[in-house]
Amino acid sequence: HRFAWYFQRAFSAMESGDELGYIRGLRLGLQAAPAMREMVDFLLEHKLKSAAQRELEELTEQVRCILAQCSPNDPAVAMLKQSEVYQKVFPLLFQQRMSASEPQTSESPVSPALLDEALAGTQEEIAASVWEHLARWGERSARSRVDYWETYPLWGSSKEAVVESLAAALSHHGADFRWLFDRLSDELSRRVLTAVVRGWRFFECAPLRGVRESRYDDYFDLDLFPRGRQEVLADLGAFTGDTFLSYVKNYGSLSYLRYYAYEITAESYQRLSQTTAPYPRVVLRRKGAGEGPGTMALHAGANKSANTLSKGETQSAETIETVALDDDIGEPLTFIKMDIEGAEQAALRGCSQHIRKERPKLALSVYHNFEDLWKLPRMIEELVPGYRFFLRYHGGDLWPTEITLLALPPKTE
């Protein structure tokens, strides 16, 4: 744990521009590596192989997560890989873990038992399990997760609330998660679902790294969404135009007939206007998407991309108009994208007529709470039975985020 902690400290120093702290952390980390090896040798010598394996497994998870956040050209990566403990111990353990618990390719079947294990237990048992696995990471690694929860309070207002909400979701909705597992349309999606749920309960980061999408941009999987013509898109949570530019990069500016972009934050909306100004047929709306017409209070998040709307108005909160897409867009839609910080369910209800009548392609963020992952597919299934569901993962290793549900309309006979 000291070994991994020193490297974590080094990379934190690097991010903050502390060059001296970066170098010192690397040096201390490498000095700790032989001590780690000596401890393992001692345990093996005393026939405590299970204990040695457990210690190594926890350490390996931490180091793999650290490496996943670094550039392959980072000198710290080269220094780490030159260390004796990395060269002699980690490769064998990596190989063992891959063969034991990780599918080798996206086509390899993932056992439903892995999902069932993460869903097993009462709410109290699951909560106790979550606290236990969080503590195994050590104080600093656990603190980094808690800090993330508190910075982005999407899953709860405190660490206790997050764990309680997670335990309730897994214990009360196991059948819904299993339904989704069976309804997903490819093996990669089932691997993503399993990795996410196990990441929630057991804080496993290696499976998340194994399913991270590296070929395609978020929302635009070219295997599932090949280039279309005369597309009419609604981008809910358009931010500064990053999704629009990604769409143009992947499909070209001649592929869309109209692009509707909705954004609630003034600063982001201004940048969105600048981003899209050179392009024709882009319609901007500084409105929130919801179930129906109304107004809501804008609340600032940790960054401009995480601002949210709520009904509880305050004197300092800006008021934003909300609309239903069914009312706000009068022409047929072929593609709807949503990344609106937990308001996806309301927005989906607000575009139900578009979905029923036109059966557009859907790209929906499903990581802003513990419910959307199964709830949004259930809602779509109720509107139009037979939609094909896929999950893609663009997030990090330490906590599951950037999970996208891609939904294709039912195949026509």
Describe each PLM feature range.
Residues R9, S16-E413:
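Phosphate/nucleotide-binding beta-alpha loop and adjacent structural elements of enzyme active sites
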